[in-house]
Swiss-Prot record:
Pfam families, per the entry: ADK (PF00406), ADK_lid (PF05191)
GO cellular component assignments: cytoplasm; cytosol
Function in brief: Catalyzes the reversible transfer of the terminal phosphate group between ATP and AMP. Plays an important role in cellular energy homeostasis and in adenine nucleotide metabolism.
Top class in the EC scheme: transferase
HAMAP family noted in UniProt: Adenylate_kinase_Adk
Superkingdom per UniProt: Bacteria
Main location: cytoplasm
Name of the molecule in the record: Adenylate kinase
Enzyme Commission no: 2.7.4.3
The encoding gene: adk
Keyword Iron-sulfur: no
Molecular-function annotations in GO: adenylate kinase activity; ATP binding; nucleoside diphosphate kinase activity; zinc ion binding
Length: 215
């Protein structure tokens, strides 16, 4: 079972990825993990990726694609995998097709966890952290007993800059603009399966299982 998992920040992609790899016994392959492994193993591509990252530059597609090719060629990925964080562009998606074709296989499905922007905003902007002990709260899903104060030590709760509304909205807009052509690409290929990510976590996974039952 060869899968790509997609979803905007706050959609619950990480939670579903954990459940998928556990139930179907396939490796969870994320871009970050691939880069770290390539650098740790000191491969030629790993060294190239490190040089770009050390300079604060984006790793170019040719390096990223090469690292993906190396990872998907490993024995544990022969019978299946869950790709997370790749592809991010149509060009990368086309290269993924080439890589899999060279390996004599193809993607089975692309699962997109779909959540409306206003729901994502509520999920992502509701996080507050205790200045004293670091305990995390969410104003909707896990609120403190007294607004603005930590349940454990009464410490002041604060919001990180990257959890503030303006920052979150900008990040979502960038992600939505980047993701749409990719969703269209996989939809035209007949590979795309959209799942309602606004349900309970367990119900989202039930829908995932229904899709994967046919593979």
């Amino acid at each position: 079972m060869k899968l790509v998992l997609m979803g905007l920040p706050g959609a619950g992609k990480g939670t579903q990825a954990e459940q998928i790899v556990e139930k179907y016994n396939i490796p969870h392959i994320s871009t970050g993990d691939m880069f770290r492994a390539a650098m740790k193993n000191n491969t030629e591509l790993g060294r190239k990726a490190k040089s770009f990252m050390d300079n604060g530059d984006l790793v170019p597609d040719e390096v990223t694609n090469g690292i993906v090719r190396e990872r998907l060629s490993e024995d544990d990925a022969k019978d299946g995998f869950l790709l997370d964080g790749f592809p991010r562009t149509v060009e990368q998606a086309q290269e993924l097709e080439n890589i899999l074709s060279d390996l004599g296989t193809e993607l089975d499905a692309v699962i997109n966890i779909d959540v409306e922007k206003d729901v994502l905003m509520k999920r992502l902007t509701g996080r507050w952290i205790c200045r004293t002990c670091g305990k995390t709260y969410h104003e909707i899903y896990n609120p403190p007993k007294v607004p603005g104060k930590c349940d454990l030590d009464g410490g002041e709760l604060y919001q990180r800059d990257d959890d503030k509304k303006e920052t979150v909205e900008k990040r979502l807009n960038v992600n939505m603009k980047q993701t749409k052509p990719l969703l269209d690409f996989y939809s035209e290929k007949g590979k795309l399966h959209n799942i309602n990510g606004e349900q309970e976590i367990k119900d989202v996974f039930v829908d995932v299982e229904k899709i994967l039952a046919s593979f």
